[in-house]
Amino acid sequence: MVGINLGLIVVSASATIIAQSFDIRSLAVALPVVGMVAGILYYQSLPEIDTDKAGGKTTLANILGKDHALLVFRIWWPVVWMSIINLWLSGLAGWPVLFCLVGLPLYWKAQKLIAARGDGDWLELDRYGYLVRLCYLTSGISCIVGVAL
Protein backbone atom coordinates (compact mmCIF):
# COMPACT_ATOMS: atom_id res chain seq x y z
CA MET A 1 0.00 0.00 0.00
CA VAL A 2 2.83 2.40 0.84
CA GLY A 3 4.45 1.70 -2.54
CA ILE A 4 1.21 2.52 -4.32
CA ASN A 5 0.77 5.73 -2.36
CA LEU A 6 4.36 6.93 -2.65
CA GLY A 7 4.74 5.63 -6.19
CA LEU A 8 1.62 5.79 -8.29
CA ILE A 9 -0.33 8.45 -6.42
CA VAL A 10 2.45 10.89 -5.49
CA VAL A 11 4.32 10.65 -8.81
CA SER A 12 1.19 10.83 -10.97
CA ALA A 13 -0.37 13.59 -8.88
CA SER A 14 2.84 15.63 -8.95
CA ALA A 15 3.13 15.24 -12.72
CA THR A 16 -0.52 16.22 -13.14
CA ILE A 17 -0.09 19.34 -11.01
CA ILE A 18 3.07 20.40 -12.83
CA ALA A 19 1.61 19.74 -16.31
CA GLN A 20 -1.86 20.95 -15.29
CA SER A 21 -3.35 17.88 -16.98
CA PHE A 22 -3.21 14.14 -16.46
CA ASP A 23 -0.85 12.19 -18.72
CA ILE A 24 -1.14 8.40 -18.67
CA ARG A 25 2.64 8.19 -19.21
CA SER A 26 3.14 9.41 -15.64
CA LEU A 27 1.92 6.00 -14.49
CA ALA A 28 4.76 4.33 -16.42
CA VAL A 29 7.24 6.60 -14.66
CA ALA A 30 5.60 5.84 -11.31
CA LEU A 31 5.92 2.05 -11.59
CA PRO A 32 9.67 1.93 -10.88
CA VAL A 33 9.08 4.17 -7.87
CA VAL A 34 6.52 1.66 -6.57
CA GLY A 35 9.16 -1.06 -6.94
CA MET A 36 11.82 1.02 -5.21
CA VAL A 37 9.63 1.88 -2.22
CA ALA A 38 8.44 -1.71 -1.91
CA GLY A 39 12.06 -2.89 -2.23
CA ILE A 40 13.09 -0.86 0.81
CA LEU A 41 10.13 -2.07 2.84
CA TYR A 42 10.78 -5.67 1.81
CA TYR A 43 14.43 -5.51 2.86
CA GLN A 44 13.43 -3.97 6.20
CA SER A 45 11.22 -6.99 6.86
CA LEU A 46 14.04 -9.50 6.30
CA PRO A 47 15.88 -9.08 9.63
CA GLU A 48 12.64 -9.67 11.53
CA ILE A 49 11.48 -12.82 9.73
CA ASP A 50 11.77 -14.98 12.84
CA THR A 51 10.52 -12.40 15.34
CA ASP A 52 7.57 -11.41 13.13
CA LYS A 53 6.60 -15.03 12.66
CA ALA A 54 6.89 -15.74 16.40
CA GLY A 55 4.75 -12.69 17.14
CA GLY A 56 2.06 -13.70 14.66
CA LYS A 57 2.83 -10.88 12.21
CA THR A 58 2.43 -11.90 8.59
CA THR A 59 4.85 -10.43 6.07
CA LEU A 60 5.79 -11.53 2.58
CA ALA A 61 9.26 -12.44 3.84
CA ASN A 62 8.07 -14.75 6.63
CA ILE A 63 5.48 -16.36 4.36
CA LEU A 64 8.24 -17.13 1.85
CA GLY A 65 10.78 -18.31 4.41
CA LYS A 66 14.46 -17.43 4.30
CA ASP A 67 15.43 -19.30 1.12
CA HIS A 68 12.63 -17.89 -0.97
CA ALA A 69 12.91 -14.46 0.66
CA LEU A 70 16.49 -14.30 -0.59
CA LEU A 71 15.39 -15.37 -4.07
CA VAL A 72 12.78 -12.59 -4.18
CA PHE A 73 15.40 -10.05 -3.07
CA ARG A 74 17.78 -11.27 -5.78
CA ILE A 75 15.08 -10.72 -8.40
CA TRP A 76 13.54 -7.50 -7.00
CA TRP A 77 16.12 -4.83 -7.76
CA PRO A 78 17.08 -6.12 -11.22
CA VAL A 79 13.37 -5.93 -12.12
CA VAL A 80 13.24 -2.36 -10.79
CA TRP A 81 16.29 -1.42 -12.84
CA MET A 82 14.88 -3.06 -15.96
CA SER A 83 11.69 -1.03 -15.51
CA ILE A 84 13.76 2.16 -15.21
CA ILE A 85 15.85 1.33 -18.28
CA ASN A 86 12.64 0.53 -20.13
CA LEU A 87 11.61 4.17 -19.63
CA TRP A 88 14.62 5.14 -21.73
CA LEU A 89 14.06 2.40 -24.31
CA SER A 90 10.45 3.50 -24.75
CA GLY A 91 11.36 7.18 -25.06
CA LEU A 92 9.75 8.27 -21.78
CA ALA A 93 13.07 9.28 -20.20
CA GLY A 94 16.55 10.26 -21.27
CA TRP A 95 19.76 8.27 -21.08
CA PRO A 96 20.64 9.42 -17.50
CA VAL A 97 18.27 6.73 -16.21
CA LEU A 98 21.11 4.32 -16.99
CA PHE A 99 22.85 5.69 -13.89
CA CYS A 100 20.40 3.62 -11.85
CA LEU A 101 22.93 0.83 -12.35
CA VAL A 102 25.34 2.69 -10.05
CA GLY A 103 23.47 0.88 -7.27
CA LEU A 104 24.44 -2.54 -8.62
CA PRO A 105 27.49 -3.03 -6.34
CA LEU A 106 25.38 -2.04 -3.32
CA TYR A 107 22.69 -4.54 -4.28
CA TRP A 108 25.34 -7.20 -4.88
CA LYS A 109 26.80 -6.64 -1.41
CA ALA A 110 23.35 -6.74 0.23
CA GLN A 111 22.35 -10.00 -1.42
CA LYS A 112 25.71 -11.56 -0.50
CA LEU A 113 25.19 -10.53 3.14
CA ILE A 114 21.72 -12.10 3.14
CA ALA A 115 23.03 -15.30 1.54
CA ALA A 116 25.86 -15.51 4.09
CA ARG A 117 23.31 -15.64 6.93
CA GLY A 118 21.71 -18.78 5.50
CA ASP A 119 19.21 -20.22 7.98
CA GLY A 120 20.92 -18.43 10.87
CA ASP A 121 20.02 -15.20 12.62
CA TRP A 122 19.07 -12.44 10.20
CA LEU A 123 18.76 -9.66 12.81
CA GLU A 124 22.26 -8.42 11.89
CA LEU A 125 20.97 -7.58 8.41
CA ASP A 126 19.27 -4.54 9.91
CA ARG A 127 22.68 -2.83 9.99
CA TYR A 128 22.92 -3.03 6.20
CA GLY A 129 19.62 -1.39 5.27
CA TYR A 130 21.62 1.61 4.09
CA LEU A 131 22.71 -0.42 1.05
CA VAL A 132 19.13 -0.75 -0.17
CA ARG A 133 18.33 2.86 0.68
CA LEU A 134 21.30 3.91 -1.46
CA CYS A 135 19.95 1.73 -4.30
CA TYR A 136 16.71 3.68 -3.94
CA LEU A 137 18.53 7.02 -3.86
CA THR A 138 20.68 6.38 -6.93
CA SER A 139 17.75 4.93 -8.86
CA GLY A 140 15.46 7.77 -7.85
CA ILE A 141 17.95 10.46 -8.83
CA SER A 142 18.56 8.76 -12.18
CA CYS A 143 14.79 8.70 -12.82
CA ILE A 144 14.38 12.37 -11.91
CA VAL A 145 17.26 13.48 -14.12
CA GLY A 146 16.26 11.14 -16.95
CA VAL A 147 12.66 12.32 -16.98
CA ALA A 148 13.67 15.98 -16.66
CA LEU A 149 15.80 15.75 -19.80
Give the location of each predicted region.
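Acidic (Asp/Glu-rich) catalytic motifs at the cytosolic membrane interface
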Residues: 38-61
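Hydrophobic alpha-helical transmembrane segments
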Residues: 1-39, 63-66, 73-149
